[in-house]
């Protein structure tokens, strides 16, 4: 039996307006090599000046994961030669990072929990981007110098499931703090996975393999499963020592395998030394006091939802997993609808209609509109069934709820006189069924309700229909 040992390095692009050491903008999708200056191009004589906002966001993150925030930290040079690094080194923090010794709790479906230790979170400058076009490689340096917070876990995870839970929790914390957009497709939340295996009960750490830059939670989970299978097969075949080497691998989603990219360097290979162009970084007491006051985090919001809205932990976790979802729900609650109905119509009905690029952030039906639709169910204006048709219409048309109801002709009839006339007609047309019902065949009651709803084209108030039929059928 083998045990899987996994540690993660997550590179979070911080959402500052300018780069880490210069005033170039960090915005995405600009023309190649236009967001650059002598500093981020590493031209001779250009000196770095630290962006203070990066420190502020680091304090917020350190507070969120209950970490030690070092009031004094230092920058170091990490030397390597890649085309996307014009300076031939990266400014990072090896010896004294800004954040150390944090922790993050992950929650399993069975209600159990596990704490994953965070070794450190350090500030570093991002590299540019290599663009491979057939036999030609191009370099875009717009991203060079963008501020990153690299969050390094301890090797505490034992399965792909734990990794996914950790990453989703970390992702939501970044979004709740609003220190980064954490967009995996745009590369602002990049994950390197370090995987090894060992015999169960063995405390030794065996050869670890790094899998780099996987851009979705699903692909990360699959890459881990494939790499663990590769290492386990090598161990069982007796080829572990020769086949499993310390290296960097890529996940090939088409061929469903991890494949070798390059040998993995040791720290000594990077020739770290203190950054000579930057002084020590000092966090003042005033900065600590101001930026350690952070917004409500996912776990806190979940606990509040359970208490305030009388829902179970699972429902609360669904609503708070993404800050956009939590904000949407709370906006619905401000309109005075029931929490139970808001939960159902948000998580089941609305989300069930999202396709392609549509999501909670750009939904054509905003929280106020969905809340009004729920209100129209609660006040008897329309039935729940009719409301689904209204929601379909609202997803395609930019109109208000009441206009949609009128256009579709779905307003519920609660006039007891009109409903009674329909009930009389249905009873008169189904005398044989009336006799059977009155002889004890109670299940036929649903037949009469269905016929009345059919005759009213779904517009009759179901409760009124039930009351009238019960009185008439006995």
UniProtKB/Swiss-Prot annotation:
Catalytic activity of the protein: L-glutamyl-tRNA(Gln) + L-glutamine + ATP + H2O = L-glutaminyl-tRNA(Gln) + L-glutamate + ADP + phosphate + H(+); L-aspartyl-tRNA(Asn) + L-glutamine + ATP + H2O = L-asparaginyl-tRNA(Asn) + L-glutamate + ADP + phosphate + 2 H(+)
Keywords of this entry: ATP-binding, Ligase, Nucleotide-binding, Protein biosynthesis
SUPFAM superfamilies with a match to the protein in the record: GatB/YqeY motif, Glutamine synthetase/guanido kinase
Gene Ontology BP terms: glutaminyl-tRNAGln biosynthesis via transamidation; translation
GO molecular function: asparaginyl-tRNA synthase (glutamine-hydrolyzing) activity; ATP binding; glutaminyl-tRNA synthase (glutamine-hydrolyzing) activity
Enzyme Commission number(s): 6.3.5.-
InterPro entries assigned to the protein according to its UniProt record, in alphabetical order: Asn/Gln-tRNA_amidoTrfase_suB/E, Asn/Gln-tRNA_Trfase_suB/E_cat, Asn/Gln_amidotransferase, Asn/Gln_tRNA_amidoTrase-B-like, GatB, GatB_C_1, GatB_Yqey_C_2, Gln-tRNA_amidoTrfase_suB_CS
Principal EC category: ligase
First and last residue of the signal peptide: none
Record note on quaternary structure: Heterotrimer of A, B and C subunits.
Protein name: Aspartyl/glutamyl-tRNA(Asn/Gln) amidotransferase subunit B
Species name: Sulfurimonas denitrificans (strain ATCC 33889 / DSM 1251)
């Amino acid at each position: 039996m083998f045990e899987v040992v996994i540690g993660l390095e997550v590179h979070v692009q911080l959402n500052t307006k300018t780069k880490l050491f210069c005033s170039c903008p960090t915005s995405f999708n600009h023309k190649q090599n236009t967001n650059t200056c002598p500093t981020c191009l590493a031209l001779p004589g250009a000196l770095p000046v630290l962006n203070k906002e990066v420190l502020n966001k680091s304090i917020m993150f350190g507070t969120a994961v209950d970490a030690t925030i070092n009031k004094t930290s230092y920058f170091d040079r990490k030397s390597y030669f890649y085309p996307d690094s014009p300076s031939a080194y990266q400014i990072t923090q090896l010896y004294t990072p800004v954040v150390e010794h944090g922790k993050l709790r992950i929650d399993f479906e069975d209600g159990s929990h596990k704490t994953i230790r965070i070794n450190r979170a350090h500030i570093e400058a991002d590299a540019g981007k290599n663009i491979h076009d057939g036999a030609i490689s191009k370099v875009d340096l717009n991203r060079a110098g963008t501020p990153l917070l690299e969050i390094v876990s301890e090797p505490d995870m034992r399965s792909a499931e734990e990794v996914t839970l950790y990453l989703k929790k970390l992702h939501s914390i970044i979004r709740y703090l609003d220190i980064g957009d954490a967009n995996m497709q745009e590369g602002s939340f990049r994950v390197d996975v370090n995987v090894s295996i060992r015999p169960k009960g063995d405390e030794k750490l065996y050869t670890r393999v790094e899998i780099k830059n996987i851009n979705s939670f699903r692909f990360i989970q699959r890459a881990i499963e494939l790499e663990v299978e590769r290492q386990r097969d090598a161990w069982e075949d007796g080829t572990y020592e020769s086949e499993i080497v310390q290296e960097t691998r890529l996940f090939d989603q088409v061929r469903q395998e991890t494949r070798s990219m390059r040998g993995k360097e040791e720290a000594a290979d990077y020739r770290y030394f203190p950054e000579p162009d930057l002084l020590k970084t000092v966090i003042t007491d005033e900065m600590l006091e101001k930026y350690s006051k952070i917004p409500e985090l996912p776990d806190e919001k979940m606990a509040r939802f359970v208490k305030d809205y009388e829902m179970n932990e699972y429902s609360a976790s669904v609503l708070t997993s993404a800050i956009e979802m939590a904000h949407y729900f709370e906006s619905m609650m401000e309109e005075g609808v029931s929490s139970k109905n808001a939960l159902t119509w948000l998580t089941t009905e609305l989300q069930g209609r999202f396709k392609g690029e549509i999501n909670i952030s750009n939904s054509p039906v905003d929280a106020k509109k969905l809340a009004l639709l729920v209100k129209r169910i609660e006040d008897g204006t329309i039935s729940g069934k009719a409301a689904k048709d209204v929601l379909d219409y609202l997803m395609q048309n930019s109109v208000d709820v009441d206009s949609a109801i009128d256009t579709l002709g779905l307003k519920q009839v609660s006039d007891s006189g009109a409903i009674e006339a329909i009930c009389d007609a249905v009873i008169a047309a189904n005398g044989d069924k009336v006799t059977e019902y009155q002889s004890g065949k109670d299940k036929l009651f649903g037949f009469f309700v269905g016929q009345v709803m059919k005759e009213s084209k779904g517009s009759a108030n179901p409760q009124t229909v039930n009351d009238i039929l019960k009185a008439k059928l006995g």
